[in-house]
Amino acid sequence: MNFDLPGTGTDQSPVFLNAADCRAWLARMPLANATQAQPMISRQINLLHRFALPPTERFAILESLRGPLSEVQDAAARQFAGKPLPLAPDEQAALDGTLGVWHLLALGYLRCFAALCVADDGRAPAPALLAQRTLSVFADWQVDLCRGQQLPDASYWKKLNQVFSAAETLGISGSAVGDPVRHGNLPTSALAAYAECTLLTTANLYELPARHLAWVARWARRWGAKLALLKAPPEDIRSRAVPLWVDLESDRPASYVPQSTTSGLWLDTTELRKSLLARVVLLEQGRAPAELQLGDDVTQPAAGQLLQRVLQRWCKGGTPRRHERHSASGGCGLIAGFEAVHFQLSGRRPFHAPSRDTATLRREREQFEVFGVRRQSVPDIMKQADSPVEAWQVADDWHLLNESATGLRITRPFVHGGRVGAGLLIAVRMPGSLHFTLGSLRWALRESSESLAAGIQLFPGEARPVAVRIVESGDARGPWLQGFLLPGIAALDEPASVIVPAGTFRIDRGIEAMVDQQMQAFKLLRVLDHGLEFERCSI
């Protein structure tokens, strides 16, 4: 069994050579300070990985490190999780350090697994435990890759598939083992850890905000044990989930599209589907997420929405595209951020809350009818002249990769341009167009050291920048805020909508909008789209 591991020697040893010394060393470490502790631990794991030790002793040391190390890694991840790309230098350093530690820990368990599998006949518990530990580190590694808006590369999937293939060959992939660090008192297995990695990749974690990513990662860990391994696909899937297919000899993750190969296996998610559907129903009946073992920090309605999302991706064959996507090319301009988009679509004029009374508005309309222009007061002109946003250079240059009627995939050099992240309101100007189209940045990924890619959902219709405010009970009104109106499009079955700041929506909430110096009133009916900073609501 060859995992392409570097050789070992005795030239430079870590500060501990047995589990007891390792625990004593950890007791002296500043584990509460991830910035200090992580590089110190990383150096010792690197030395341990290259130092010759009996595999049983190496395994005992890794087990002593694993619990405290997981807490340090969780603390370090808070520095980069959910942050826009490119990361700031301190955020990038935290990400690099975190991924480096997971890589070294995975290699350490791999070394133990390879050595003990050769020496053992497969009937002892050691190989089953080692396979589960190795695969579980790969799962933690994948979660932090997605938190840093990266995807596992081919070498990751090759090693993951190799380990699980070896566990299958030894007949221990489904053997129950304990893992107090990740599963408490519940039993787990190598198959459950491998299934967890599969659930993580099919969930497209990088599209989620940091809080929701943590929920789905927790669910994948908890429910990986519900997946079953099949040698052949089910003959009749009418009452079953759509199985995932994986080639254990490949360097690719599982998918719903089987290929012609002799090393393919299927992962059946039928039991998981039953569990998800039951939870969705109970949430709709008013049960609390914590009662359904979704987590004490999980809230509604986000819990139900996320369960529906993973149900589609884990059990129903993935999410089909509404419109066919095809290759495209050309440069496009992108503006990211609610305020910047409003500024650009307003003719690069800064936002000022409407403050004139009804009589003033009537007089200005009369002036417009007579003179053809709206006269501005001296304070209005002075406010615009003093506004710093007029100097904004808010449009970044991107390159179009593919497109559909409702979406785009674009790319740009990684370090050039502003920071972008999932959930931002954006405006994009397509090749050959003079106008911007409004949309949402669905995801952003660092594809290499030099490339940043992003996926965009386009909103139909020509957006109109307006001022909006909430109508409270009685005569109370909220402050004027930036917003956008989008027309209804009957051919696309798209209702008229308004884009408001996140947190505005309530069913039947009254909204007023100032449009061309005229007040319009309407009610919010339902949320059509939402992001970190906006909600698009039908009216």
Feature map (PLM): residue ranges:
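Context-gated lysine
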Residues: 83, 158-159, 226, 231, ...
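Extended, domain-scale alpha-helical bundle/helix-rich regions
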Residues: 177-360
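Short strand-loop-strand
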Residues: 316-434, 440-463, 472-539
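Long, leucine/valine-rich, helix-dominated scaffolding and oligomerization segments
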Residues: 2-198
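Short, flexible coil/linker segments at or flanking structured domains
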Residues: 10-14, 19, 41, 53, ...
